[in-house]
């Protein structure tokens, strides 16, 4: 890959999921990469091991040797000294999605969009293509067990990308195949209304060339509603609604899901994926439909889905004591994702006591969806709510908004056992008590959220292993 005379790229916020993935892609493509972030960790250490120069904190001098500066939507350009220094020095400054769009020029793009399921579906497509011998280039906003990372630089013609709708980023991409996995109200700080969000999805899908294809989930009403606005060829997939590609005979047991695919009059039995939940069957159908559109052998698609081994923080089992105690970490942070994750746990382990540990993400999202979170979480046997993870927001901008709103909504929705625990040490103590008290019916400690609740899941898992809970 070449980007004119560009040899060295500096990335502001390099430790984020999306930014670290593009950093890894650039490194593997032969570019020099430097980057800055406010904290270090496993991700930045891995990038450093691959040759990136990592800076802790932001300083103007750190951009002096670069040819371009890339930043994410989470970074405010007007508040960042590195971006200001680059602009003053005449160094080009671009958003991540613009850089990604440029890199896509060299490949045939398969872009997976949707409010939910983007990461998993992208990884499933990538796994299938690799197993089919296609050697794709891949970039996912998460860590794939199969890929052992978030990026792959392949020699084949396909580039598989997770397409993020936040800040309208996906409108800079150039897909040949666009997957619309799901669609409902989200990122209202960007879009303002659901109608505006739907228009953005239509614009994204219509970026597909006349010879391409849009793969649409028929189970989502909002996606069904926009199909008529697409001026491109469409393939539909789904479970509950009539579709070109559908699933029957769905069976969930011990964390795996098996089913039969029916596609365009043909039947493909024996599909098995290493993750629970009907939502993951939908994700697999999206991947299968994509493979069919590429003309791949259906037998290889079935095999490829069987090789999919999950994603970090997507119903990731962190600890299994073999006696019924599971510690599970999941990225679910939207009410629909929380609902689907809890349903997957209930269907996969019907007799287990489900203890939900939820960290609300963003004050704005908590304010908007407190009631919906309550209904979703009320399905658990016990619910613990931690403090809100603010991410890019400031608490003082949202007076009166706290995680207690979610706890109250759980009670209002019929949840009988819920605790809002703001102190992380106390929360850990209570969860270890839950683990120690796990009985013969089994207990699932299900951690959910897009913030640092994942660290708590890891701590509890480590304690479980150390103390043989």
Curated annotation (Swiss-Prot):
<dbReference type="Pfam" id="PF08245">
    <property type="entry name" value="Mur_ligase_M"/>
</dbReference>
<keyword id="KW-0547">Nucleotide-binding</keyword>
<comment type="function">
    <text>Cell wall formation.</text>
</comment>
<dbReference type="InterPro" id="IPR013221">
    <property type="entry name" value="Mur_ligase_cen"/>
</dbReference>
<keyword id="KW-0436">Ligase</keyword>
<feature type="binding site">
    <location>
        <begin position="114"/>
        <end position="120"/>
    </location>
    <ligand>
        <name>ATP</name>
    </ligand>
</feature>
<keyword id="KW-0573">Peptidoglycan synthesis</keyword>
<comment type="similarity">
    <text>Belongs to the MurCDEF family.</text>
</comment>
<keyword id="KW-0963">Cytoplasm</keyword>
<dbReference type="GO" id="GO:0008360">
    <property type="term" value="P:regulation of cell shape"/>
</dbReference>
<dbReference type="Pfam" id="PF02875">
    <property type="entry name" value="Mur_ligase_C"/>
</dbReference>
<keyword id="KW-0961">Cell wall biogenesis/degradation</keyword>
<dbReference type="InterPro" id="IPR036565">
    <property type="entry name" value="Mur-like_cat_sf"/>
</dbReference>
<dbReference type="InterPro" id="IPR005758">
    <property type="entry name" value="UDP-N-AcMur_Ala_ligase_MurC"/>
</dbReference>
<dbReference type="GO" id="GO:0071555">
    <property type="term" value="P:cell wall organization"/>
</dbReference>
<keyword id="KW-0131">Cell cycle</keyword>
<dbReference type="Pfam" id="PF01225">
    <property type="entry name" value="Mur_ligase"/>
</dbReference>
<dbReference type="GO" id="GO:0009252">
    <property type="term" value="P:peptidoglycan biosynthetic process"/>
</dbReference>
<dbReference type="GO" id="GO:0005524">
    <property type="term" value="F:ATP binding"/>
</dbReference>
<dbReference type="GO" id="GO:0005737">
    <property type="term" value="C:cytoplasm"/>
</dbReference>
<keyword id="KW-0132">Cell division</keyword>
<dbReference type="InterPro" id="IPR050061">
    <property type="entry name" value="MurCDEF_pg_biosynth"/>
</dbReference>
<keyword id="KW-0133">Cell shape</keyword>
<dbReference type="InterPro" id="IPR036615">
    <property type="entry name" value="Mur_ligase_C_dom_sf"/>
</dbReference>
<comment type="pathway">
    <text>Cell wall biogenesis; peptidoglycan biosynthesis.</text>
</comment>
<protein>
    <recommendedName>
        <fullName>UDP-N-acetylmuramate--L-alanine ligase</fullName>
        <ecNumber>6.3.2.8</ecNumber>
    </recommendedName>
</protein>
<dbReference type="GO" id="GO:0051301">
    <property type="term" value="P:cell division"/>
</dbReference>
<keyword id="KW-0067">ATP-binding</keyword>
<dbReference type="InterPro" id="IPR000713">
    <property type="entry name" value="Mur_ligase_N"/>
</dbReference>
<dbReference type="GO" id="GO:0008763">
    <property type="term" value="F:UDP-N-acetylmuramate-L-alanine ligase activity"/>
</dbReference>
<dbReference type="InterPro" id="IPR004101">
    <property type="entry name" value="Mur_ligase_C"/>
</dbReference>
